[in-house]
Amino acid sequence: MRITDDILYVGVNDHNIDLFEGQYIVPNGMAYNSYVINDEKIAVMDTVDAAFGDEWLKNIADVLNGATPDYLIIQHMEPDHSANIQKFLEVYPNIKVVGNAKTFTMIGNFSRDLKLADENKLEVKNKDTLTLGKHELTFVFAPMVHWPEVMVTYDSKDKVLFSADGFGKFGALDAEEDWDCEARRYYVGIVGKYGAQVQNLLKVAATLDIQTICPLHGPVLTENLEHYIGQYNTWSSYGTESEGVMIAYTSVYGNTKKAVELLAEKLKEKGCPKVVVTDLAREDMAEAVEDAFRYGKIVLASTTYNGDVFPLMKTFIEHLTERNYQNKTIGLIENGSWASMAGKVMRGMFEKSKNITWLETSVKIMSSMDEQNKADIEKMAEELM
């Protein structure tokens, strides 16, 4: 795939993977992106997962037609982007690996047998440039987006931002699917904790004339960049992307579920633009976390369990708070047959979260709904509108 006259795609698709980072379901696989900048000096941007080293090297050889690369630029050291450094050096022993100080420390930690000679290293600092000929690359450090060594690279000639894991998504490149959905799930799950750091990177990006974004996962972005950047701004500022209400629940014998179904019915009757109901025991946790960040209002409904809150609800809330969940309105429905604790526990788990607005109405069920519970659900629906 040719991106510009001089920039070519040499990445790979992975349709064998079932879990990304050991936890995220990827039914449409993953793409590990790598790029060649073909100039007087030739640069290769990042490597790919270890399982695809031979395919990647063949892709590079095919586009270079016998030419030899001069630089291997490592923007991010996660193994799905750096695992083939040694293999690359075996084929091209005279190249320079370009990275920052943290990059080279991590290379040593991940590849104990790889001893990079000084002549094979080019250490760069923030805002350093590298001239390939017509192309001048500027390296912009982006620590904790989402690892400490991350840097992005801007090519001023073709106005391309090589964005590391930023603007990435789940799914191989041959998967036909909506960008927003799988990019949102990727962002929230993997980068979501680091909103402040993403905001810092977006401020730098705003000073650049960007016409193309080349991420390490997902498609190359060439059109409607305002949309993609706008989405990243919303996600990283913990804003509301879509109007509506998410209801996340756990239910042991179905009584809490009945309360949730009644609330969803009332919201729809009142014209709520979107009601998303998620059974945390049966639906993908990453999808649930994604929706919790997407909508501005959420209702948590759960049972007391062993003097605590039901375990899957606890896990769900932990996923939210560890990703700096904030700027949301939350309502609570709790159920307990005696000594109900779920509401208190759920609320307490958000005590360090910023800018949380609690609904005045809460619902406390004793085993099964009574008329007062139904009235409270009606009132909660009104308050959510």
Predicted feature descriptions by range:
Residues R2-D5, V98-V150, Y194-N200:
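Metallo-beta-lactamase
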Residues L173-I213, H217-V220, L262-T278, A288-M385:
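FMN-binding flavodoxin-like domain, especially the glycine-rich phosphate-binding loop
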Residues R2-I60, L64, V152-D155, K159-S163, ...:
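Conserved beta-strand hairpin/beta-sheet module of binuclear metal-dependent hydrolase folds
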Residues C214-E241:
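Short N-terminal or domain-adjacent regulatory/targeting segments
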